């Protein structure tokens, strides 16, 4: 079976959006960021959604519905939220309808990237990382999620690599598998 999409999963700050956009550009495929789709759909930031009464549960429901809408199309690079894999049905849908690539990084690398992102003009707020000890929170969440991330088709350690290097690895691997 040829899988028709590439899904990029991984912890917050692993580079999913940046790398996904780069891979889509290189392959001339459509790039979709699920978090951005949710923001567009709800007219609320991810942080605002998390602050609603239903909080994370409500966000995960919207995330699942958005994924279900997207899997019916082809030639897409889909960047997911870091926690999408917490729902086993989401992971199964991605594995059945595409090739799942996990971007992995050490907790210190993730913290550095998230701090750099928070300094950008976007001022991205990561609700699940709202903590006095962010490194400890990253380690805890990563330890919980890593066994699920390991079910991906391919895992790339991104520490010390540029988005272009990671993108080239993804494309090289994709070509080997599907040529």
Task: Describe each region flagged by the PLM.
Residues 1-3, 22, 26, 143-179:
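NTP-dependent small-molecule kinase module
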Residues 8:
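Hydrophobic anchor at the beta1->P-loop junction of P-loop NTPases
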Residues 11:
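P-loop (Walker A) phosphate-binding loop of NTP-binding proteins
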Residues 14:
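ATP-binding Walker
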Residues 17:
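Walker A/P-loop
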Residues 25-36:
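Post-Walker A helix-loop "phosphate-sensing" segment adjacent to the P-loop in P-loop NTPases
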Residues 34-83, 88-95, 120:
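ATP-dependent small-molecule kinase phosphotransfer cores
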Residues 97-146:
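A glycine- and Lys/Arg-enriched "phosphate-lid" helix/loop adjacent to the NTP-binding pocket
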